[in-house]
Curated annotation (Swiss-Prot):
Site residues, Basic residue of the functional dyad: K28
Site (Aromatic residue of the functional dyad): Y37
Role of this protein: Blocks human voltage-gated potassium channels Kv1.2/KCNA2 (IC(50)=0.7 nM), Kv1.3/KCNA3 (IC(50)=26.2 nM) and blocks intermediate conductance calcium-activated potassium channel KCa3.1/KCNN4 (IC(50)=56 nM).
GO cellular component labels: extracellular region
Residue pairs linked by disulfide bridges in the UniProt entry: C7-C29, C13-C34, C17-C36
Protein source organism: Centruroides tecomanus
Transmembrane segments: none
Pfam families membership: Toxin_2
Name of the molecule in the record: Potassium channel toxin alpha-KTx 2.16
Annotated domain remarks: Has the structural arrangement of an alpha-helix connected to a beta-sheet by disulfide bonds (CSalpha/beta).
Key words, A-Z: Amidation, Disulfide bond, Ion channel impairing toxin, Neurotoxin, Potassium channel impairing toxin, Secreted, Toxin, Voltage-gated potassium channel impairing toxin
Any GO molecular function: potassium channel regulator activity
Modification sites for Isoleucine amide: I39
């Protein structure tokens, strides 16, 4: 899921992704936005 959070590194996506999917969330930074996925 791509969320509307700007990023330059995946670390910036860690908290919003965990808020979305809980502790087992994965995160990437793609094209300046966070992408979250369930592991």
């Amino acid at each position: 899921t791509i969320i509307n959070v700007k990023c330059t590194s995946p670390k910036q996506c860690l908290k919003p992704c965990k808020d979305l999917y809980g502790p087992h969330a994965g995160e990437k930074c793609m094209n300046g936005k966070c992408k979250c996925y369930k592991i």
